[in-house]
């Protein structure tokens, strides 16, 4: 029992830390004695410290739990897969917060609630990852979504940010309604919401008549809700506008964190049952459509953030290959792809934030970056080459393993489409590199030095992207264990 308490202590800690920071901000930001001080940087550092402590608590608690455990009225499950996804989520949150401080100064952004909302959404996604019941899963998704709606519109003086928040609210509410309808259909057909009970019903009993059709429709609606949340085609239409209009740190967070938690839920919900083949076909077609649209639509973009938005859609297609395979190797490749995508995207948006210091918005503004800031240009080039899947960078290892898993399960067409779209994607990634090194800018821009936080973040993520191929075995071994733990 004591070991189980230590295992769930990270969630307890970060929830308490979030509310303490909220009280701290409310009390001191309204203090007339202290002349109403701006607390966003102060709360930001404390929030980053809270995330890092939670990360250490997770790492310390992992060896204490040798088997899977259910806790809090069996609504949540703690196992190796949970640990992996939660650690990746906290790394992404820490990276997002660490790149925010210079943004606060440049934009004169002094709303400390920004950090509190990031922490609150992180809490909800930690619960999403460990959720083992449809009710717990849906409530965690809704808490996460409410935080994201406010974060997208947090830059109140920008009409683009306000528009992004409103669009996200309307479309997100629509997708949540679809998800809830699917959960209610499953409950109405089976009388169960717990994943263990659903697994027994779907695998151990004969389901006939109305119950069978009700379960199928419920799973279909849940799948649509999930695909909307991860911006898979054809449910992607909201992503480019919202990614572009939101503040850049929010865009970075939206590009990474929800995908980690939703893919964890996808594997939890759909790993069992007699409807796996149908779901694999749905993800098969969404994967192909996402890869094709992500590659072709990105070619026409002129803005950096919109290009990264379509690149994100394309990478969701690649990651969906892993689930489409329906094998242990497929799930392992999905986790590898998700891990490398998260760290590469943190790197890319940290560079975009560094460019924002001089209001770089369009791809054309990157002209001659190699002459004005060669280190930043080289780092951005490494990131783009990794996105394109050029060896020996980490992105190549990710795509190689995903395609290898597709070939292993006989999905030759899926692997072929992935290779072709990767080649097409090389065009717009290399176009960025060509713009930085060989083009003359419309106006010369003198880039300011980066702050220490982003420099350290870029150094760590760039080192991982560049040197991963030298020793990939630990990640391959860990992800294989995580994939196996889903079936235990």
Curated annotation (Swiss-Prot):
Membrane-spanning segments: 4-24, 45-65, 84-104, 111-131, 134-154, 168-188, 215-235, 252-272, 282-302, 308-328, 334-354, 375-395, 400-420, 456-476
GO terms assigned for molecular function: NADH dehydrogenase (ubiquinone) activity
Bilayer topology annotation: Multi-pass membrane protein
Entry GO CC: mitochondrial inner membrane; plastid
Catalytic activity: a ubiquinone + NADH + 5 H(+)(in) = a ubiquinol + NAD(+) + 4 H(+)(out)
Residues making up the signal peptide according to the UniProt record: none
Any one biological process term the GO annotation gives: ATP synthesis coupled electron transport
Family in the record: Belongs to the complex I subunit 2 family.
Function of the protein: Core subunit of the mitochondrial membrane respiratory chain NADH dehydrogenase (Complex I) that is believed to belong to the minimal assembly required for catalysis. Complex I functions in the transfer of electrons from NADH to the respiratory chain. The immediate electron acceptor for the enzyme is believed to be ubiquinone.
Miscellaneous comment text of the record: Exons a and b and c, d and e are cis-spliced, while a trans-splicing reaction is required to link exons b and c.
HAMAP family per UniProt: NDH1_NuoN_1
Protein name: NADH-ubiquinone oxidoreductase chain 2
């Amino acid at each position: 029992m004591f070991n189980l308490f230590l295992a769930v202590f990270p969630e307890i800690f970060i929830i308490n830390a979030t509310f303490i920071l909220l009280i701290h901000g409310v009390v001191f930001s309204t203090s007339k004695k202290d002349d109403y001080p701006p607390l966003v940087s102060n709360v930001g550092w404390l929030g980053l410290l809270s995330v890092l402590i939670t990360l250490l608590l997770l790492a310390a608690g992992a060896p204490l739990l040798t088997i899977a455990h259910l806790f809090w009225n069996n609504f949540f499950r703690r196992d190796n897969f949970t640990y992996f996804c939660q650690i990746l989520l906290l790394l992404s949150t820490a990276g997002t917060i660490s790149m925010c401080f210079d943004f606060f100064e440049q934009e004169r952004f002094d709303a400390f609630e920004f950090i509190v909302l990031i922490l609150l959404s992180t809490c909800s996604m930690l619960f999403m990852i460990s959720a083992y019941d449809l009710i717990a899963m849906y409530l965690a998704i809704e808490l996460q979504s409410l935080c994201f709606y406010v974060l997208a519109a947090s830059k109140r003086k920008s009409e683009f940010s306000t528009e992004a928040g409103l669009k996200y609210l309307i479309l997100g509410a629509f997708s949540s309604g679809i998800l809830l309808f699917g959960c209610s259909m499953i409950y109405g057909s089976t009388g169960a919401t717990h994943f263990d009970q659903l697994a027994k019903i779907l695998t151990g009993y004969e389901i006939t008549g109305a119950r069978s059709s009700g379960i199928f429709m419920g799973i279909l609606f849940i799948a649509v809700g999930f695909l909307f949340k991860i911006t898979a085609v054809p449910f992607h239409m909201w992503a480019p506008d919202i990614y572009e209009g939101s503040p850049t740190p929010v865009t970075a967070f939206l590009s990474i964190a929800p995908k980690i938690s939703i893919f964890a839920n996808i594997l939890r919900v759909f790993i069992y049952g007699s409807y796996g083949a149908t779901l694999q076909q749905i993800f098969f077609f969404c994967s192909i459509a996402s890869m094709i649209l992500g590659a072709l639509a990105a070619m026409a973009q002129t803005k950096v953030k919109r290009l990264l938005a379509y690149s994100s859609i394309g990478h969701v297609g690649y990651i969906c290959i892993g689930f489409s395979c329906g094998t242990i190797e497929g799930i392992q490749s999905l986790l590898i792809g998700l891990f490398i995508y998260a760290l590469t995207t943190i790197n890319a948006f940290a560079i975009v934030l560094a460019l924002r210091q001089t209001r770089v918005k369009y791809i054309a503004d990157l002209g001659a970056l190699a002459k004005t800031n060669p280190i930043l240009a080289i780092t951005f080039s490494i990131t783009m080459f990794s996105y394109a899947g050029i060896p020996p960078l980490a992105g190549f290892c990710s795509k190689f393993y995903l395609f290898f898993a597709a070939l292993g399960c006989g999905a030759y067409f899926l692997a072929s489409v992935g290779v072709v779209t990767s080649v097409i994607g090389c065009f717009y990634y290399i176009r960025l590199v060509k713009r930085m090194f060989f083009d003359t800018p419309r106006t010369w821009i003198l880039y300011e030095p980066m702050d220490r936080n982003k420099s350290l973040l870029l150094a760590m993520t760039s080192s991982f992207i560049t040197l991963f191929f030298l020793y990939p075995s630990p990640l391959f071994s860990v992800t294989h264990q995580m994939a196996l733990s889903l079936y235990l």
